[in-house]
Swiss-Prot record:
One term of GO molecular function: adenyl-nucleotide exchange factor activity
Record protein name field: Protein GrpE
Compositionally biased residues, Acidic residues: 13-35
Record's subcellular location: Cytoplasm
Keyword flag Cytoplasm: yes
Species this chain originates from: Geobacillus kaustophilus (strain HTA426)
Lineage: Bacteria, Bacillati, Bacillota, Bacilli, Bacillales
Subunit structure: Homodimer.
Length: 213
């Protein structure tokens, strides 16, 4: 009897279902380590703990001021050099323009100067007096050539310098004689010995004159 009860109890023990074990919840991960295994809070603490920038010393400030002064001096020197170069360039350009204008204005100077002796010869020849009809005809032809030459030079700006009766002008006249002359103020041209010429406002040859005392 006891043996039968024992078997029944053992069987009941074996047949009892297993109790479910409670499932433990996984712990939420802690905001842990970033690289290097350092917690974020500690990492932030390190950043906050960085020291402030160091103020420059008096020596560093003095060196910086000296460098600034040196740069300002160099800048001022470069500015002066630029202004000088610009002024030189402007002077060169103005001088070149004036030379070109003068070359255009006085382009006939060389030819006119070479023709002045020819005009002198024509004038001396035309002063000859003759009764010979053939010589008169030649002189008339020479006068026509002379007038044509004078007109051509006049178109280029060549003109004779006025002399007799004009006040002596050392720029226009060359005094070769002085003499008493009635009816003339002192220092007045009383006679023209050789005609002078000018090209526009430039004297090609001054007139050779006699001047009153």
């Amino acid at each position: 009897m006891e043996q039968g009860e024992k078997q029944v109890m053992e069987q009941a023990t074996y047949d009892e279902p297993e109790r479910e074990q409670p499932i433990e919840e996984e712990a939420a991960p802690q905001p842990e380590e970033e690289s290097g295994g350092v917690p974020l809070e500690e990492a932030g603490g390190e950043e906050a703990a960085e020291p402030a920038e160091k103020a420059p010393t008096a020596e560093e400030l003095a060196a910086a001021k000296a460098q600034i002064a040196e740069l300002e001096a160099k800048l001022s020197e470069m500015e002066h050099r630029y202004l000088r170069l610009y002024a030189d360039f402007e002077n060169f350009r103005r001088r070149t323009r004036q030379e070109m204008e003068a070359a255009e204005k006085y382009r006939a100077q060389s030819l006119a100067s070479d023709l002045l002796p020819v005009l002198d010869n024509f004038e001396r020849a035309l002063k000859i007096e003759t009764d010979n009809e053939q010589a008169k005809s030649i002189l008339q032809g020479m006068e026509m050539v002379y007038r044509s030459l004078v007109d051509a030079l006049k178109k280029e700006g060549v003109e004779a310098i006025e002399a007799v009766g004009k006040p002596f002008d050392p720029y226009l006249h060359q005094a070769v004689m002085q003499a008493e002359a009635e009816g003339y103020e002192p220092n007045t041209v009383v006679e023209e010995l050789q005609k002078g010429y000018k090209l526009k406002d430039r004297v090609l040859r001054p007139a050779m004159v006699k001047v009153s005392q």
